């Protein structure tokens, strides 16, 4: 019975941590939006002129990258792999935290069921 209580408590802690990190990301995105809104129209026009010649693109999954910001998608990360002694960084879809939390919940439920037997 104590094991079941520990599993349930750890499950609640993991869900709380996952939700707080999502809230931090939302706050950061809102903060970024307000920064963009406060710029003057002239600055926007200058930025568009300067960056108009530059290519704005994101790297698709399983193509080489340098950091996470270059990869397309929220759950896509720039992960390093070693091939023939050389490090290669590729954009990979890791499924995000939601997938990991759901997998943890599934494992916890199966352990709780086995505790009841």
Swiss-Prot record:
Entry's Gene Ontology cellular component terms: extracellular region
Range of residues in the leader sequence: 1-20
Record-annotated disulphide pairs: 58-72, 65-78, 69-115, 71-91
Tissue note: Expressed by the venom gland.
Region (Disordered): 20-55
Subcellular location: Secreted
Compositionally biased region (Basic and acidic residues): 23-55
Keywords in alphabetical order: Disulfide bond, Ion channel impairing toxin, Knottin, Secreted, Signal, Toxin
A GO molecular-function descriptor: ion channel regulator activity
Propeptide: 21-56
Role description: Putative ion channel inhibitor.
Family: Belongs to the neurotoxin 03 (Tx2) family. 02 subfamily. HNTX-XV sub-subfamily.
Domain notes from UniProt: The presence of a 'disulfide through disulfide knot' structurally defines this protein as a knottin.
Protein name: Hainantoxin-XV
Species the sequence originates in: Cyriopagopus hainanus
Source organism phylogeny: Eukaryota, Metazoa, Ecdysozoa, Arthropoda, Chelicerata
């Amino acid at each position: 019975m104590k094991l079941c209580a520990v599993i349930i408590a750890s499950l609640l802690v993991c869900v709380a941590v996952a939700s707080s990190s999502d809230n931090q990301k939302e706050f950061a995105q809102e903060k970024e939006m307000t920064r963009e809104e406060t710029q003057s129209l002239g600055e926007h026009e200058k930025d568009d002129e300067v960056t108009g010649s530059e290519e704005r693109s994101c790297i698709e999954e399983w193509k080489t990258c340098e950091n996470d910001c270059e990869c397309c998608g929220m759950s896509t990360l720039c992960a390093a792999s070693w091939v023939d002694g050389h490090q290669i960084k590729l954009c990979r879809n890791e499924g995000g935290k939601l997938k990991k939390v759901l997998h943890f919940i599934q494992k916890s439920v199966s352990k709780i069921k086995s505790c009841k037997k």
